[in-house]
A protein has these predicted regions:
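Predominant activation on well-ordered alpha-helical scaffold segments within soluble catalytic domains
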Residues: 90, 226, 230, 266-269, ...
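C-terminal motif of bacterial Sec signal peptides marking the signal peptidase cleavage site
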Residues: 17-19
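Structural detector for internal amphipathic alpha-helices that build alpha-solenoid repeat scaffolds
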Residues: 301-311, 321-322, 331-343, 351-352, ...
Length: 610
C-alpha cells in the first residue's frame, strides 16, 4: 500500500488533470466521500482486482449556477437594485438582443432570480435536471407565483485566488416556477420568493466517469485494465458493440455507463472495481469458493455479492444459494446482485424486502427497476397495493423507469402542464404530489370521493363549492363585466382536477385544491408530498422496532445509495450516503373553520364564514 502522503498527493494531481473536482476543492466533497468508501473494500481472496490499482473519478455532483429573469408575475415583481447579479443579467439579456433591459427590470411583472442545479455523475448532454430559483436579497419582488423562467445559462462557479471565475455554459434552465409555498401550504413570504422548475434544466455537456491508475502506470497496464473491464461489460450503440472502458492515457481510463446501471452509478463503479485483472481457472475456483463462504456470512455478504456480480453469470449459482439463507441480509444482497444479472429468481426476494424492511426498500426498488424480466414487473405491480406510501409511490416510479410507455403508468398530460396518473390500488386511497423530476400527480385508487365543500380554493381565482344535488361547482373569478366561467362535475378527485384545468388552472392550483380539501376534511384519501424511499436507515434484525444493545449495533446497508429517487435540491449536492434524514410530508386534516388571519386563504375563509 502506498504511503498516505504520496497517495493523497497523487489523487490531487490526477483530479486536477482530469477536471473532476468540486467547485471549492473541499476534501469532504461527495467524490472524496466515495473515494474513502471505495478504499475500504479490502480484497481477501489474494487475486488482484481493478480496484487495487485504481481510484474512481467523476462521482461528484457539479453545482452550476446562473442569473435569469422570471416574467408573467401578477404585479409581485420588482427591481433588485444595483448589483453584480443585475449587471450579469443585463449582459445575458443583451446577448439575446433584448431591448431596454434596464427599463424591463423595473417592471412589476418580472424579477431577477438566481438559478442553480446539480449535474449528477455520468450525466449526458440533453439530460434534464431540477432547477431552483431564488430571489436575491434587497429585491422588491414579493412572490414568484405564476412566473415563468426565461431561458438562462448556467455555469460552474469557482473561487480561485480570492476571485470568482465561471466556466463554459454547462446547463440551460427554463420553465414555469412552482413556489415552495405550494408544497408547504402556506403564504410564507420567504417561500413565496423561492421555487423550483421540475425537470427544467438541460445539461449542455456529458460528464464521463473515469478510473485513475495509481503509481507509475504504463500504456500496457492501462490497456490490460481496460481489457479486463470490457470482458465483463460492453454496450451496444449504432456502431455495434463496444467495451465500456476506454484507456485515454497511461494513468486514466474513461468509463461509459452500462445501461443496466443507469440508475445506480455508484454501484456500477464498485462492481467494475471488483473485476479481477488476471485470474487463472484454478484461481477462479478458489476465489468463488471463498466468496461463497463470505456471502453466507451476514457481516461480509454485501462485499462478497459485489465480487460475485462482477464475475457475472458464471457466479449466479452461488448467489442463488444465498436466496435460501435464513438471514434476511444474505437473501437481500444475493437478490440485489442477481437483479443486475437480470435473473428472475431475484424478484420475489426484492419485492419482499421493499415491502417489509425500510432499510432495504430504496435498494430493492432500484434493483427491480433495472430488471427486464417480467418477474420484476409483477413484483413492482404487487407493491402498488401495500399500505406504505413510499413503497407504493416508489414502485410506481420504478415502473416508469422500466418503461414509461407502459399503459399501467403512462398516464396523460393535463393542460400541457403536469402529468396525471390514476393507478388501481387495493390499499387505502392516496394522492401523491411530486416535487422532483417533473410536475406529477398520482391517484392511488379510482373514484376517490370529495365531500362537497362549503368552499375551497384552487389558486386565488378558482373557487370550488358543493351543489344542492351533491356535485361540485367550480367558478373562475375574472375582472371586468364578462361572466365568470364555471364548470360542474361529480364529487370525485379525478373530475375535480380536470375541471380545474379546463378553467385555466395548472399544477399549483391543483395542489392547493388538494391540500385545502384534505385539511378541510373533504377528502378521505391522504395527500402525500414527495413520498420516496429514504437513505440512512439501519436494519435492526427481523424486528425493525427492536432496540439494539451497544454490543449489537444496528446494521447500516452497505451498498452505495442509488439515484432513482433522490431529490437533489433537498440534499444540497451531498451524496445520498451523507444527506440528512427527512421524511415525506403528509397533509393532515385540520378544521375547515380555522381562523388564520395572517394569510390570504385564512382571510378568505373568515370572510365566507361570516
Amino acid at each position: 500500500m502506498m504511503p498516505r502522503l504520496s497517495t493523497t498527493t497523487w489523487i490531487v494531481g490526477l483530479l486536477l488533470i482530469s477536471g473532476c473536482y468540486s467547485p471549492l476543492m473541499r476534501w469532504q466533497s461527495p467524490e472524496s466521500d466515495n473515494v474513502a468508501l471505495l478504499a475500504e473494500e479490502d480484497n481477501e481472496e489474494g487475486v488482484e482486482l481493478v480496484g487495487d490499482t485504481t481510484i474512481p473519478l467523476g462521482l461528484d455532483y457539479r453545482k452550476i449556477e446562473g442569473v435569469s429573469l422570471v416574467n408573467g408575475l401578477n404585479g409581485t415583481g420588482g427591481d433588485s437594485g444595483p448589483s453584480s447579479l443585475r449587471s450579469s443579467l443585463i449582459s445575458e439579456m443583451q446577448s439575446y438582443d433584448v431591448r431596454n433591459p434596464q427599463q424591463l427590470l423595473q417592471s412589476p411583472t418580472v424579477s431577477l432570480v438566481v438559478v442553480r442545479g446539480w449535474l449528477p455523475p455520468g450525466v449526458e448532454k440533453g439530460d434534464s435536471f431540477d432547477v431552483e430559483v431564488v430571489v436575491p436579497p434587497k429585491s422588491k419582488t414579493t412572490s414568484l407565483r405564476q412566473g415563468y423562467l426565461l431561458k438562462g445559462r448556467m455555469r460552474e462557479i469557482r473561487v480561485l485566488d480570492n476571485a470568482v471565475h465561471s466556466g463554459h455554459v454547462a446547463g440551460l434552465a427554463q420553465g414555469p416556477v412552482i413556489v415552495d409555498s405550494i408544497f408547504g401550504g402556506t403564504d410564507d413570504e420567504v417561500l413565496e420568493t423561492r421555487g423550483r422548475i421540475l425537470g427544467g434544466g438541460q445539461s449542455q455537456l456529458t460528464r464521463p466517469l473515469g478510473l485513475g491508475i495509481r503509481g507509475n502506470s504504463t500504456v500496457r497496464h492501462a490497456a490490460a485494465i481496460g481489457a479486463a473491464i470490457n470482458s465483463r461489460f460492453h454496450k451496444t450503440d449504432r456502431n455495434g458493440q463496444s467495451g465500456v472502458a476506454r484507456p485515454k492515457r497511461d494513468n486514466y481510463i474513461e468509463l461509459a455507463v452500462h445501461p443496466r446501471y443507469k440508475n445506480n452509478i455508484h454501484r456500477y463503479v464498485r462492481v467494475v472495481r471488483s473485476i479481477a485483472l488476471k485470474e487463472s481457472p484454478g484461481e477462479r475456483v478458489l476465489r468463488t469458493e471463498s466468496l461463497e463462504r463470505r456471502l453466507l456470512e451476514p457481516t461480509a455478504s454485501a462485499r462478497a455479492a459485489l465480487q460475485l456480480e462482477a464475475i457475472g453469470e458464471d457466479a449466479a449459482h452461488i448467489l442463488l444459494k444465498g436466496l435460501e439463507s435464513s438471514s434476511p441480509e444474505v437473501r437481500f444482497y444475493s437478490a440485489e446482485a442477481l437483479a443486475y444479472l437480470d435473473r428472475e429468481e431475484a424478484a420475489k426476494t426484492l419485492g419482499w424486502a421493499a415491502a417489509n424492511i425500510s432499510a432495504f426498500r430504496w435498494y430493492a426498488l432500484t434493483a427491480l427497476a433495472t430488471m427486464d424480466h417480467v418477474a420484476a414487473y409483477e413484483a413492482l405491480n404487487e407493491l402498488l397495493h401495500v399500505p406504505s406510501a413510499e413503497t407504493r409511490y416508489g414502485a410506481f416510479r420504478a415502473l416508469r423507469s422500466r418503461n414509461a410507455a407502459d399503459p399501467l403508468v403512462r398516464g396523460e398530460s393535463l393542460g400541457g402542464g403536469f402529468a396525471f396518473h390514476v393507478i388501481s390500488s387495493e390499499a387505502a386511497p392516496m394522492i401523491h404530489v411530486s416535487k422532483s423530476q417533473r410536475p406529477e400527480i398520482v391517484l392511488f385508487g379510482q373514484h376517490q370521493k370529495v365531500v362537497p365543500p362549503a368552499f375551497l380554493f384552487a389558486g386565488k381565482e378558482i373557487m370550488i363549492k358543493g351543489t344542492e344535488d351533491g356535485r361540485l361547482r367550480l367558478i373562475r373569478f375574472t375582472t371586468g363585466d364578462q361572466e365568470d366561467p364555471q364548470e360542474t362535475c361529480d364529487a370525485e378527485v379525478d373530475p375535480m382536477i380536470r375541471a380545474i384545468v379546463r378553467l385555466g388552472g395548472g399544477y399549483c392550483e391543483v395542489v392547493q385544491a388538494l391540500r385545502e380539501a384534505r385539511q378541510g376534511g373533504y377528502l378521505d384519501a391522504k395527500v402525500v408530498v414527495n413520498a420516496m424511499a429514504r437513505p440512512n436507515r439501519t436494519y435492526h434484525g427481523d424486528d425493525a422496532s427492536e432496540a439494539t444493545s451497544p454490543d449489537e449495533p444496528p446494521i447500516r446497508v452497505a451498498n452505495p445509495v442509488p439515484e432513482l429517487f433522490v431529490d437533489r435540491l433537498e440534499t444540497d449536492g451531498e451524496t445520498a450516503d451523507t444527506m440528512p434524514r427527512y421524511e415525506p410530508e403528509e397533509v393532515s386534516e385540520t378544521p375547515a373553520e380555522d381562523s388564520d388571519t395572517s394569510s390570504f386563504m385564512g382571510r378568505m375563509r373568515n370572510w365566507f364564514a361570516k
